[in-house]
Each structure stands twice: as C-alpha cells, then as structure tokens.
Amino acid sequence: MRPEGRAAGQIRPLRLTRHYTKHAEGSVLVEFGDTKVLCTASVDEGVPRFLKGQGQGWVTAEYGMLPRSTHSRMAREAAKGKQGGRTMEIQRLIARSLRAAVDLKKLGEFTITLDCDVIQADGGTRTASITGACVALADALGALVAAGKLKESPLKGMVAAVSVGIVAGGAVCDLEYVEDSAAETDMNVVMMEDGRMIEVQGTAEGEPFSHEELLTLLALARDGIGQIIQAQKTALEQ
C-alpha cells in the first residue's frame, strides 16, 4: 500500500498558484503533496557573451533549498562558499528542460532566469521545479508580448517532469520521500506535451531493472506527465 493509499500511477495532489510574488515577470508556487517549490522567471535584456550578435535568447536556471526545507536543518550553500554537485546537476537539468520548450530565435536577445527555491521537500523537488518553472516561464513570455517586446510567445509547448520508480517490487509514479528512500529503482523523466522526451535519468539503487520494467516506468511517467500538463494548462487559463 502506498502512502495515502495512492494507486501506482496516481500523482500526488498538485497545485499551481500563479503570480505568487509581485516583482518577477512570472512566479508560481508549485505543490506536489508536501513538496513545495517557489519558481520565478526573471527577464533581462541581453544574452551571455557566447550568444552576442546571434539574434537569439537564452534560458538558464538556479536551484536551491531553504535550510529547513528538510527534516533537519541544512547549512546554506552560500555559507559554505560553493554550490554542491547535486545543486549544479539539478539546475542544469531545469535549464536544459526549459530551453527545449522555447524557440530561442523567436525569443530575441533576452535572457530568462528561472529561480527554483525549495520551501519544503518531500521527494521530487527537481521534477516539481521543472513543472512550476514552465508555468512561470509561460507567464514571463506572455509579459514580454504584453509589453510589445515580442510579437508572439516563443513557447513551443508545455514541459513537465515526474519521478517514477520500483518500490517493494512494484512500479509507481511520483515518489514521495519515504518511497524514494526505499526505491529499488529511481527515475526522473522530462517530457514535452507532445510526448517527446527531453531527459530520462534512471538508476538501479538495489536490484538492476529489466527492459520490460523500463518500458513500464516510461509508460507510467508518460501518463503522469499527461496529468501534470493538463494541470499546467488549466492554471494558465485562470
């Protein structure tokens, strides 16, 4: 039995609250059960040096966890003087995922920075960050259009992500912390709304997984992401 009696393919209760802060061009509080992440999208004119003069934009990301977002307090990375490897890996994943959603040529010479700050962690913080950041990105692009700086939104489609894994011998979708810590296989999947995959990160923590189990996990992820993208679209219509 899963926590809260969820079915194998059932995601946690999902909530996307837009315009959560007033300064950023896009801001979303995303909640997957007890995992809560604040995602903001900030627009700056200009692009990194390696893109200057090419007539295209850039999307980048930063990720962090508040000290007491976890069961016991973590020291701030700023206090340590450097980012950890996990943080750098996750923010690169978020940036890669969201760049896939944007026509960078149509964006023009603007840079959009997605900041994902974990307020409370209960598993799936990187997938929640991607899901929330995509909605914040859509709002930021809409703000550029509304300001007359872009003729149309360069968003090619929604992007969302979910974790899947094998827990106690069974494939499940959207793992919370107690499941993630006990998973025999843990996988994060990022997809476009048309079903094309952007990234698949999968690791056997205990017993290696079979080809058939891989296909089962990908099917669970596809169905879960379908539910998430519908929630994103519903939020953007409000």
Curated annotation (Swiss-Prot):
**Chain sites annotated for binding phosphate:** 86, 124-126
The protein's matches in InterPro entries, at most eight in alphabetical order, are given as: ExoRNase_PH_dom1, ExoRNase_PH_dom2, ExoRNase_PH_dom2_sf, PNPase/RNase_PH_dom_sf, Ribosomal_Su5_D2-typ_SF, RNase_PH, RNase_PH_bac-type, RNase_PH_CS
Asked whether the keyword tRNA-binding is assigned, the reply is: yes
Q: Name one GO biological process term.
A: tRNA processing
Q: What is its EC number?
A: 2.7.7.56
- What would you give as a GO molecular function for this chain, any one? 3'-5'-RNA exonuclease activity
Q: Write out the catalysed reaction.
A: tRNA(n+1) + phosphate = tRNA(n) + a ribonucleoside 5'-diphosphate
Which UniProt keywords are present, listed alphabetically?
A: Nucleotidyltransferase, RNA-binding, rRNA processing, Transferase, tRNA processing, tRNA-binding
Q: Does the keyword RNA-binding apply?
A: yes
Top-level taxon: Bacteria
**What family does this chain come from, according to its entry?**
Belongs to the RNase PH family.
The record's section on NCBIfam families has: RNasePH
| HAMAP family, per database record | RNase_PH
Which PANTHER family does this UniProt record tie to the protein?
Answer: EXOSOME COMPLEX COMPONENT, EXOSOME COMPLEX COMPONENT RRP41
Quaternary structure and interacting proteins, as annotated? Homohexameric ring arranged as a trimer of dimers.
Provide the function of this protein.
Phosphorolytic 3'-5' exoribonuclease that plays an important role in tRNA 3'-end maturation. Removes nucleotide residues following the 3'-CCA terminus of tRNAs; can also add nucleotides to the ends of RNA molecules by using nucleoside diphosphates as substrates, but this may not be physiologically important. Probably plays a role in initiation of 16S rRNA degradation (leading to ribosome degradation) during starvation.
Protein name as annotated: Ribonuclease PH
Q: What organism does the UniProt record list as the source?
A: Edwardsiella ictaluri (strain 93-146)
